[in-house]
């Protein structure tokens, strides 16, 4: 049964009425990894899986919510002290509170929602949930909050109600996503531009290694520190360098002897990655997917050898992609596990999947997962 039908039926059973249906999307990031907190570019797009919710105002000061995926019903008020215990419900509660903080009106509503974003694959299911409700509440109460602020409502929900200090990329992609386009977002200025991404004759497939190595958060903080150290050293000679992404490669060479070797490698990766995003955008405008793919491989090399956030499983998948003549492949997300994102020609797709299915479990003792994704629209009302 399709998701919308399932939601409609459950809503009718629980609330005896019909509401309006809203949806938002998970996201991929084609290139531009670990650049967000360095003030650089990211290059995400919304994908064809996400969250869908039916919502109807109920004339009270209570939200009554049912999650189909968790098979759980929760009621909560709209004041700060009413925060629900359930993690999934605190996302909806946070969106309500953050809307109020921005001068928006929020009153009670009934809702049933479900999702088809694979959890734990780094596709931002939480951002899809926040964006669905930020969009729905804005629409139903006619709050006229602009799209930028809807994305920030999602981000602030993570910060203030879910204990996650995330950047803006996931929510931005989820709200601004457009079918057949990727979004180049400048994380320092929040300027953005759409680029066509509709590769005829190619598939975009994620291979989930199904591993998550534990050191992720401490290692992540250490890398942020390295980047800040490098930026600080460069800033002494070049005052215009606010973030590492503002630096030129030759400026980094000038301070090579002043910073630890590790900091130099981290900075070398980031400065290179900022340029690669721009090169990929140029290539897409020319329709040159070979260059796009080559840049993806270069990013993987940088993440593995310079930034050192890959792992044996992801490096194995990347090498296997090269062997199978996959156009582009790289680790996607924070690293230390998770997915590779692969741009594969249609005629090579079956052979690539078969090779991974055979060779990955033989080496690592468990099966990977595969997700084909298509670049799609972000937050919207579903007719």
Label each PLM-derived region with a short phrase.
Residues 127-128, 339-343:
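FabD-like malonyl-/acyl-CoA
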Residues 336:
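Glycine-rich phosphate-binding loop
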Residues 2-27, 52-85, 181-328, 343-383:
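C-terminal nucleotide
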Residues 39-46, 223-224:
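Short Gly/aromatic-enriched secondary-structure transition segments
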Residues 1-22, 28-41, 75-79, 85-198, ...:
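Gly/Ser-rich oxyanion-binding loop with an adjacent helix/lid
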Residues 44-46, 54-57, 103:
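Short, charge-rich binding segments
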